[in-house]
Amino acid sequence: MVEHSPHRPIRSFVLRQGRLSNAQRRAHETLMPKYGIPYSGKLLDLAIIFSRSAPKFLEIGFGMGETTALIAQAHPQNDYLAAEVHTPGMGSLLKQVEELELTNIRVIQHDAVDVLQHALPPECLDGVHVFFPDPWPKARHHKRRLIQAEFVDLLCSRLKPGGYIHVATDWEDYAEQILEVLSGEPHLSNTAVGYAPRPEYRPLTKFEQRGLRLGHEVWDVIFRKKQGA
């Protein structure tokens, strides 16, 4: 695997001033000290952060947090570190964590690429979820798409052997790119022939259910890190 440069001039997101509800603001202000992990650029010890030894998963760009909360609730035996840059989504997930009394989620409000490069040690993750990343549909913006070869190499370096990367998208041309990029990583192997069926652990969101009723498709791509890689 390549040496990963700390310099990253092209970001896969734009920080927009989204509407922050009063409930999201309160949750962000009151619950970040309890569930939030400040980003310092120093390595994190996930066993200490979660106060136990358990399978560890990284959730990248969780939106409003519905899927992340449902996954964590259904799998209390696992721990989930959730990275997101947008405050409304962070507040929304924190509110759900408190309401559902989840003890297996911690959040970090920072760019996931920096978190992977500087805060997570090699081979510390059992899985990575990247559900519905920004598709950047215009051709001139494709360079901003998160799933690129260098990023996948970085993800792979943080996975334990046997750990997996799961990406889901509802943009067909992005799905094709994701499948091509992950297929090009020599340390990964596809868990399916082409696209994978949606696994039971990824719940259908209300947005996705509505899209499916309208005939929209969703593509899941799941690759696993080879043993000995």
Swiss-Prot record:
Pfam families membership: Methyltransf_4 (PF02390)
InterPro entries per record: SAM-dependent_MTases_sf, tRNA_(Gua-N-7)_MeTrfase_Trmb, tRNA_methyltr_TrmB_bact
Involved pathway(s): tRNA modification; N(7)-methylguanine-tRNA biosynthesis
Protein name: tRNA (guanine-N(7)-)-methyltransferase
HAMAP family assigned: tRNA_methyltr_TrmB (MF_01057)
Family designation: Belongs to the class I-like SAM-binding methyltransferase superfamily. TrmB family.
Keywords recorded for this protein, A-Z: Methyltransferase, S-adenosyl-L-methionine, Transferase, tRNA processing
Positions that bind S-adenosyl-L-methionine: E59, E84, D111, D134
Catalysed reactions, as listed in the record: guanosine(46) in tRNA + S-adenosyl-L-methionine = N(7)-methylguanosine(46) in tRNA + S-adenosyl-L-homocysteine
Organism: Nitrosospira multiformis (strain ATCC 25196 / NCIMB 11849 / C 71)
Gene Ontology molecular functions: tRNA (guanine(46)-N7)-methyltransferase activity
